[in-house]
Curated annotation (Swiss-Prot):
Main location as per UniProt: membrane
Compartmental location: Membrane
Traits of the deletion mutant: Impairs the synthesis of austinol and dehydroaustinol.
Membrane spanning stretches: 19-39, 49-69, 75-95, 114-134, 138-158
GO BP: terpenoid biosynthetic process
Paired cysteines (S-S): none
Name the record gives this protein: Terpene cyclase ausL
Purpose: Terpene cyclase; part of the gene cluster B that mediates the biosynthesis of austinol and dehydroaustinol, two fungal meroterpenoids. The first step of the pathway is the synthesis of 3,5-dimethylorsellinic acid by the polyketide synthase ausA. 3,5-dimethylorsellinic acid is then prenylated by the polyprenyl transferase ausN. Further epoxidation by the FAD-dependent monooxygenase ausM and cyclization by the probable terpene cyclase ausL lead to the formation of protoaustinoid A.
Listed GO MF terms: lyase activity
Membrane topology: Multi-pass membrane protein
Length: 204
């Protein structure tokens, strides 16, 4: 967050830019809490707390905008890098207990197959995120690529509950942090567009 942005927030705390920045902070804390809670719940229940698609999409998005297009994430850059490392911890815990989630299937018989599955899906999503950034520009690609991550995270969580038939691997903290972060991130995007922080007619 630049010194100019901070001064504007102090001068106009209820402006679109100020509210957007405060919502970004809320989203940053919320998602970090969500990822840490997923690591804990996965270890405690010995069952992945996140499905394949949202985890792989998240890691691909974070890799793209933390290391390939860091300028597109602006002052989110440091946060996205923190999320990337937190997600590697989530991935490690997930791969450790993923065979329990795939028991009775060919994938569940070999951890190596699961590693290849996750690697392939991450690579596919990374290619998609890169194409999105090239087509729309980094600024819009950052936000719309993140929106895809949020959609998959929420919908796949519901899918896990329905297919598993129990709440192991899930918790109120995970769901609550995700809901708050999603709401904060969506409204922050709207505020960025309104304030002009995210251009809607040019590539970055």
């Amino acid at each position: 967050m630049s010194q100019l942005t901070i001064s504007k927030i102090i001068e106009e705390p209820f402006s679109a830019l100020s509210l957007s920045e405060m919502l970004k902070i809320l989203a940053a804390l919320g998602w970090s809490t969500n990822y840490l809670a997923m690591v804990y719940r996965t270890q405690a229940d010995k069952l992945p707390a996140i499905a394949v698609l949202p985890l792989c999409c998240d890691i691909a998005w974070e890799f793209t905008y933390a290391w390939i297009y860091p300028q597109a994430s602006g002052h989110w850059q440091g946060v996205v890098r923190v999320w990337f490392f937190l997600h590697t911890a989530v991935l490690a815990a997930t791969l450790r207990y993923a065979p329990n989630d795939w028991a009775g299937t060919p994938l569940g018989e070999s951890r190596g197959r699961l590693v290849l599955l996750y690697a392939a899906v991450i690579a596919a999503f990374a290619a998609g995120q890169l194409c999105l950034a090239l087509e729309m520009g980094g600024a819009l690609g950052f936000h719309w690529g993140g929106a895809l991550c949020q959609f998959l995270s929420s919908s796949a969580a519901v899918g896990q509950l329905l297919t598993r038939g129990h709440t192991r691997g899930a918790s109120l903290l995970i769901w609550g942090a995700r809901a708050i972060s999603t709401a904060g991130g969506d409204r922050a995007l709207i505020g960025c567009v309104v304030s002009g922080a995210v251009p809607i007619d040019q590539k970055a």
